[in-house]
């Protein structure tokens, strides 16, 4: 489960109004992006992030998320970007068919990059300062 938070005056986390301010694209669109971001976090941390059979919470600062995803985008984009945007993220050179300009980006890579970069933009634009998710593991 995702829980977004924004910093409070006391330095703690409070539930943000992010999900209430995401029109006009609609909540389903952004929920899909957040689910993709969750997959990215699992890609990096996997079972190593959790004690076996116990609920754990992994908290990443926004800068931490940026660090992880920027590295991932660089890895997948390889030489497919020409410059970086104002957040330091690669600007991909995608043709209308959705592939990189040399045809080497497959659909998975394209979707992975698009979802993670859009999720990062979303967090940045909404001033989200941290991302939390909780995973419950059960005995088999």
Curated annotation (Swiss-Prot):
One of its GO terms (molecular function) is thioglucosidase activity. The active site is at 70 (nucleophile). It catalyses: a thioglucoside + H2O = a sugar + a thiol. The lineage of its organism: Eukaryota, Metazoa, Ecdysozoa, Arthropoda, Hexapoda. This is Myrosinase 2. Homodimer. InterPro entries: Glycoside_hydrolase_SF (IPR017853). It is an enzyme of class 3 (hydrolase). Keywords: Glycoprotein, Glycosidase, Hydrolase. Degradation of glucosinolates (glucose residue linked by a thioglucoside bound to an amino acid derivative) to glucose, sulfate and any of the products: thiocyanates, isothiocyanates, nitriles, epithionitriles or oxazolidine-2-thiones. Belongs to the glycosyl hydrolase 1 family. The keyword Glycoprotein applies. It comes from Brevicoryne brassicae (Mealy cabbage aphid). Optimum temperature is about 40 degrees Celsius. Glycans are attached at residues 114, 127. Inhibited by ascorbate. Its EC number is 3.2.1.147.
